[in-house]
């Protein structure tokens, strides 16, 4: 990065500054898709499904079995998982990541000390409500079963920290037609950045999900 904000002798408040807007873009990176990890053929394109009305997908099937797909969801899209052969070792990656987030990262993200056990309870509640329109009040009630002193403000603060750590990512409601008179749900779906974190939060395994 080249930086030149003016002569070093110029007072800081008088130097010309540039925020980078229009020249520097931010890019959010996600764990790998099955196509990126070479486990999906990529024969069906999401873009083509929407843009190509004549696209024919009849007869196209995945070469992966249900059991294999479950294992891959539990493993997740972590690049390190491709470097280990043992399925047991692959499953440990998401578990270790979850432990690191709860024990360390959630307090380090903004230098606010947080309770690792409460973080685990919130992640477990999210996992129970994965890809649903569950309300925060319902998830808070779930957490309060084991930690009854938790209040909504604390719950929201932890969720915000977990989103900044790219662990949680709620998905906004999708409206295909802006002018459509059809009533649609506007709530957000409760999701993780990778399904393997939800599996780890629940203490589940490929066998228990089959």
Question: Residue ranges of each PLM-predicted region?
Answer:
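Conserved nucleotide-sensing/catalytic segment adjacent to the nucleotide-binding pocket
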Residues: 1
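Interdomain motor-coupling "hinge/lid" segment immediately C-terminal to the ATP-binding subdomain
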Residues: 4-128, 132
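Accessory nucleic acid-recognition modules appended to NTPase machines
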Residues: 82-210
